[in-house]
């Protein structure tokens, strides 16, 4: 079965084709994928502008679809089903992909299914070279979400913890903006932190010893105050008198605080549910400091960590195609009505 996946939940336009008959140890059925990022568009504003995101998806969907067909060397008539991101995300952006996908499926007389964006991230590591077996704990960490989930099977999800305010990725972006770094903040903070001392400044770890929920708003405030009160930080009010080492130390200290919080919660979650496999997915999962720290700390408790392939860490169509395939195989499909859900708890998903 060839499934076209469409991802338009935020600022990436991602399309991919998953072919269940081409699953090998090398590509796990990914026939091809194309991805267009709107980073340059939104960098001018320091963050994603929803209306601009929607309009850009509209401009890019058809050209990217044609490019994907050419890359895979197939025609549209060879597509067997369509999977599109139904939510959560920016409602206008979601609607562009949903309407394109549902219309294409109707025209080709093939089934279509709306996919949960975060389930796509959760299942993306199953497309890797060393896919984890259920059950496992999953840390879904991105610009819009920070979730700890006990996954017992596809659609069998138990929320162990989540952010009660800002997501970890959002905190990265805002801290980067305070330091005068360009959007997106996560990769730029990580790059700057490489030359910094993570022990230079002490930052709080909110709710570290209070269950499995997360809170990053206090950390964001602490970074703001640190930058404001530190000479030569290059941040708000200090831009003309900046010291590269001071800025690198702040970035490294901030990154270490976020990573320390995430890792300790993951270890606690694994112990709480008596599992030994951790899956980490979402844009922040690409952070090398997070990966190294997780591998070191999980080795101490005889647990393993699994990631999505590098190209599938950020938003992409491949994860949507694969998640859609799994649900289509279980006999699930949507009717002609198109609906998108900006907020959608994963616990509401049906089991496969």
Curated annotation (Swiss-Prot):
Entry's EC annotation: 2.3.1.234
Cofactor note: Binds 1 Fe(2+) ion per subunit.
Catalytic function, reaction form: L-threonylcarbamoyladenylate + adenosine(37) in tRNA = N(6)-L-threonylcarbamoyladenosine(37) in tRNA + AMP + H(+)
Keywords: Acyltransferase, Cytoplasm, Iron, Metal-binding, Transferase, tRNA processing
UniProt cross-references to Pfam families, sorted A to Z: TsaD
S-S bonds: none
Subcellular location: Cytoplasm
Single GO BP term: tRNA threonylcarbamoyladenosine modification
Enzyme class label: transferase
GO molecular function: iron ion binding; N(6)-L-threonylcarbamoyladenine synthase activity
Residues reported to bind Fe cation: 117, 121, 315
Record CDD domains: ASKHA_NBD_TsaD_bac
Residues that coordinate or bind substrate: 140-144, 173, 186, 287
PROSITE patterns, per database record: GLYCOPROTEASE (PS01016)
GO CC list: cytoplasm
Requisite cofactors: Fe(2+)
Role of this protein: Required for the formation of a threonylcarbamoyl group on adenosine at position 37 (t(6)A37) in tRNAs that read codons beginning with adenine. Is involved in the transfer of the threonylcarbamoyl moiety of threonylcarbamoyl-AMP (TC-AMP) to the N6 group of A37, together with TsaE and TsaB. TsaD likely plays a direct catalytic role in this reaction.
Protein family (similarity comment): Belongs to the KAE1 / TsaD family.
Name of the protein described by the UniProt record: tRNA N6-adenosine threonylcarbamoyltransferase
Organism: Psychrobacter cryohalolentis (strain ATCC BAA-1226 / DSM 17306 / VKM B-2378 / K5)
């Amino acid at each position: 079965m060839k499934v076209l996946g469409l991802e338009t939940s935020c600022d990436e336009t991602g399309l991919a084709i998953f072919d269940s008959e081409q699953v090998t140890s090398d590509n796990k059925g990914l026939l091809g994928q194309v991805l267009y990022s709107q980073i340059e568009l939104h960098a001018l504003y320091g963050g994603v502008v929803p209306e601009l995101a929607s309009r850009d998806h509209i401009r890019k969907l058809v050209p990217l679809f044609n490019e994907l067909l050419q890359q895979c060397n197939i025609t549209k008539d060879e597509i067997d089903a369509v999977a599109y991101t139904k939510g959560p995300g920016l409602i206008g952006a979601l609607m562009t992909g949903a309407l394109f996908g549902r219309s294409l499926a109707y025209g080709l007389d093939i089934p279509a299914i709306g996919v949960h964006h975060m389930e796509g991230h959760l299942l993306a590591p199953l497309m890797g070279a060393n896919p984890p077996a259920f059950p496992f704990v999953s840390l879904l960490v991105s610009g819009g979400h920070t979730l700890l989930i006990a996954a017992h099977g596809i659609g069998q999800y138990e929320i162990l913890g989540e952010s009660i305010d800002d997501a970890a990725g959002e905190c990265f972006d805002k801290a980067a903006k305070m330091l005068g770094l360009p959007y997106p903040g996560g990769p730029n903070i990580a790059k700057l932190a490489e030359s910094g001392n993570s022990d230079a400044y002490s930052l709080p770890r909110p709710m570290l010893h209070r269950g499995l929920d997360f809170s990053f708003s206090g950390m964001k405030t602490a970074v703001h105050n640190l930058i404001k009160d530190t000479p030569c930080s290059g941040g708000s009010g200090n831009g003309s008198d900046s010291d590269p080492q001071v800025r690198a130390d702040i970035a490294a200290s901030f990154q270490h605080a976020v990573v320390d919080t995430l890792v300790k919660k993951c270890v606690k979650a694994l112990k709480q549910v008596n599992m030994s496999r951790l899956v980490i997915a979402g844009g922040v999962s690409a952070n090398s400091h997070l990966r190294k720290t997780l591998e070191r700390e999980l080795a101490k408790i005889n647990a393993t960590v699994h990631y999505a392939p590098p190209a599938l860490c950020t938003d992409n169509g491949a994860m949507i195609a694969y998640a859609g395939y799994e649900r289509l195989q279980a006999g699930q499909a949507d009717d002609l009505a198109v609906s998108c859900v900006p907020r959608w708890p994963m616990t509401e998903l049906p089991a496969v």
